[in-house]
A protein has these predicted regions:
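Active-site-adjacent structural elements in enzyme catalytic domains
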Residues: 9-24
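Secretory-pathway/luminal and periplasmic proteins that interact with or process carbohydrate-rich
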Residues: 4, 21-31, 156-164
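Extracellular/periplasmic catalytic domains that process cell-envelope and extracellular macromolecules
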Residues: 7-11, 81-84, 120-121, 143-147
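Peptidoglycan-targeting cell-wall enzymes and recognition modules
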Residues: 20-128
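Proteins synthesized as precursors that undergo proteolytic processing into mature forms
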Residues: 120-122, 131-134, 138
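Acidic helix/loop microenvironments that form the catalytic cleft of cell-wall polysaccharide enzymes
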Residues: 19-22, 139-160
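Non-transmembrane alpha-helical segments in soluble domains
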Residues: 16-19, 101, 125-126, 151, ...
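Extracellular low-complexity, O-glycosylation-prone Ser/Thr/Pro/Gly-rich "stalks"
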Residues: 159-177
Length: 178
């Protein structure tokens, strides 16, 4: 796999630094959408929940929350929970699953999306980097700017930027030493 994607140390550092953060240290390969308080929901998705009261019905209800935040976009037709984030970079949305399954010749992912969390967690991350031209950015070096730009594409914002920077730099040091 690494040969197919020509994983240089810089590319590997960016990929693994982002994956480390998104997966909680490579421990979480399926998006956890169980939030016990509406305050936390509103803090995580302020653009979807203007007030804490708006988030109240979604606390302790991951399926309902996923349908609210992911339903009707990214190719989802009200099936946000089915197409929630999975894999080391949290592949999200029916459109992304469809593209991944097609380009990687893994049609079974469309009938069993949990495969993206289990058997293909690393492949989803590689595919996402390639499909979104993130390896091209990674080739520019391991800098604040490149980590920030890749984070924006992976996360849609800058959530966890400090950790992503720390992990990417640490992994880059290890890979460059070897």
């Amino acid at each position: 796999i690494a040969k197919h994607y020509d994983l240089s140390p810089m590319r590997g550092a960016h990929l693994m630094g982002q994956a480390h953060h998104e997966s909680g240290g490579f421990k979480k390969v399926s998006e956890g959408l169980y939030y016990s308080t509406p305050e936390r929901i509103q803090a995580v998705w302020p653009s979807r929940f203007a007030t804490v009261e708006d988030a109240e019905p979604y606390a302790k209800n991951p399926e309902k929350l996923a349908d609210k935040v992911y339903g009707g976009r990214m190719g989802n037709k009200g099936q946000g929970y089915l197409w929630r984030g999975r894999g080391f970079l949290q592949l999200t949305g029916r459109d992304n699953y469809r593209k991944f399954a097609g380009e990687m010749r893994l049609p079974e992912v469309m009938t069993n999306p949990d495969l993206a969390a289990n058997e293909y967690a690393f492949e989803t991350a590689l595919w996402f980097f390639e499909a979104n031209k993130l390896f091209k950015i990674a080739d520019e070096g391991v800098t604040d700017d490149t980590i920030r730009r890749i984070t924006k594409r992976v996360n849609g914002g800058y959530h966890g930027l400090d950790d992503r920077m720390e992990q990417t730099r640490k992994i880059n040091t290890w890979l460059m030493a070897g």
